[in-house]
């Protein structure tokens, strides 16, 4: 396994729309393993392949406290089951050090393939539902900062650009 470099906002590669995985093979399973290692090391609770500059529709998530519930979503698709919105303070490994309140549907259905290529379906609520939507945004070239005001987004961009110019990670 290997740690992968995580792209940081405003890197334009984060805006790339990921392509579907055509076959779940050893290279995809290796990517999944590397993504989990990277996510746990960061530390984070979710990581999309786009964030590590691999533009395939692959997401890894583990919202457990003890890293005991790893979930893999390959070619995920979501359906909103309840239009009622939930508010969560979201952060992102690609927008380090910033957290903002984002509204998202609180109950969804997700269909995807697992690490072995088997189809599955979940109906998560709460934090897991929010995390899945956040990571799927990455696969579609979106970031959580796209859900906040242009002023706040501009402020975050400016602070991160200054940090990058100073060579701080």
Curated annotation (Swiss-Prot):
Q: Which chemical reaction does it catalyze?
A: N-terminal N-formyl-L-methionyl-[peptide] + H2O = N-terminal L-methionyl-[peptide] + formate
Where does the chain bind Fe cation?
Answer: 92, 134, 138
Q: Does the keyword Iron apply?
A: yes
- Its Enzyme Commission number(s) read 3.5.1.88
Which sites are catalytic? 135
Q: Name one GO molecular function term.
A: metal ion binding
Keywords, A to Z? Hydrolase, Iron, Metal-binding, Protein biosynthesis
Source taxon at top rank: Bacteria
Stored InterPro entries = Peptide_deformylase, Peptide_deformylase_sf
Cofactor(s) required for function per UniProt: Fe(2+)
What's a GO biological-process term for it? Answer: co-translational protein modification
Details of cofactor binding: Binds 1 Fe(2+) ion.
TM helices/strands, residue ranges: none
What this chain does, per the entry, is described as: Removes the formyl group from the N-terminal Met of newly synthesized proteins. Requires at least a dipeptide for an efficient rate of reaction. N-terminal L-methionine is a prerequisite for activity but the enzyme has broad specificity at other positions.
Question: Sorted alphabetically, which HAMAP family does this protein's record hold?
Answer: Pep_deformylase
Which family does the record claim for this protein?
Answer: Belongs to the polypeptide deformylase family.
> Protein name, please?
Peptide deformylase
């Amino acid at each position: 396994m290997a740690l992968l470099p995580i792209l940081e906002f405003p890197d334009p590669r984060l805006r790339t729309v990921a392509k579907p995985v055509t076959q779940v093979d050893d290279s995809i399973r290796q990517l999944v393993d590397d993504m989990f290692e990277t996510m746990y090391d960061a530390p984070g609770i979710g990581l999309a392949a786009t964030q590590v500059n691999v533009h395939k529709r692959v997401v890894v998530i583990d919202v457990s406290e003890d890293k005991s519930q790893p979930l893999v979503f390959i070619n995920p698709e979501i359906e909103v089951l309840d239009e009622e919105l939930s508010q969560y303070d979201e952060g992102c490994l690609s927008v380090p050090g910033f957290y903002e309140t984002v509204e998202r549907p609180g109950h969804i259905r997700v269909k995807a393939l697992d690490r072995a290529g088997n189809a599955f379906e979940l109906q998560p609520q709460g934090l897991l539902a929010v995390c899945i939507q956040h990571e799927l945004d990455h696969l579609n070239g979106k970031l959580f900062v796209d859900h906040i005001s242009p002023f706040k987004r501009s402020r975050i961009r400016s602070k991160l650009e200054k940090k990058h110019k100073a060579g701080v990670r």
